[in-house]
Swiss-Prot record:
GO terms for cellular component: plasma membrane. Keywords: Cell membrane, Membrane, Transmembrane, Transmembrane helix. It is found in: Cell membrane. One of its GO terms (biological process) is floral organ abscission. Pfam families: CASP_dom. This is CASP-like protein 2A2. Belongs to the Casparian strip membrane proteins (CASP) family. It is a multi-pass membrane protein. Residues 1-22, 91-96, 167-178 are cytoplasmic. The keyword Transmembrane helix applies. Residues 44-69, 118-145 are extracellular. The keyword Membrane applies. Involved in floral organ shedding.
Length: 178
């Protein structure tokens, strides 16, 4: 192989690395935007009627959802900037750190979505054996907005599952096991 062939291989690896970094940054920015959307919908979600008033701050699961979406949005922004700013090639410590933090954010957001989905389910359908009736008959728009926020949160968790796969692939294919 002559020097020209080696240069072509190095340049194609650099382009692939830039493409990989750009795609990952786009996924992180998209998850940030969706997290903020879910967070804003839930924060603005309140209703008052003859039965009383309710807002997200009255329900622990929804407060956790707002917190998890806020943490995810902040981490998504910081990690997208870090991905774009990291030198090529990135070190093993940087790859492991991204992998670990991606895993943590994935599970935090997934847990927030799951507990909030259970709360929304109970609000829509109640629990007949213990005589809980549906709350959404009285607070329809609140339930609808909560459901939309939960859907956004699950989409974010899917994006973070994909990002976790990318970071695990990067870690386990490019570096030896610890």
């Amino acid at each position: 192989m002559d020097k020209t062939d080696q240069t072509a291989i190095d340049e194609s690896a650099l382009v692939l690395n830039r493409t990989e970094k750009s795609a990952e940054a786009v996924l992180r920015v998209a998850s940030m935007a969706l997290s903020i959307t879910g967070l804003v919908i839930m924060i603005k979600n309140s209703i008052s009627n003859e039965f009383g008033s309710v807002s997200y701050s009255n329900i622990g699961a929804f407060m956790y959802l707002v917190s998890a979406n806020g943490v995810c949005a902040a981490y998504s922004l910081l990690s997208a900037l870090a991905i774009l700013a990291l030198p090529c090639p990135i070190s093993k410590v940087q790859v492991r750190t991204l992998f670990l933090l991606d895993q943590v954010v994935t599970y935090v957001v997934l847990a927030a979505g799951a507990v909030s989905a259970e709360t929304v389910y109970l609000a829509y359908y109640g629990n007949i054996p213990i005589t809980w009736s549906s709350a959404c008959d009285s607070y329809g728009s609140f339930c609808h907005n909560a459901l939309i926020s939960v859907v956004f949160t699950f989409v974010v968790s899917l994006l973070y599952m994909l990002l976790s796969l990318i970071s695990s692939y990067r870690l386990f294919t490019r570096f030896e096991a610890p």
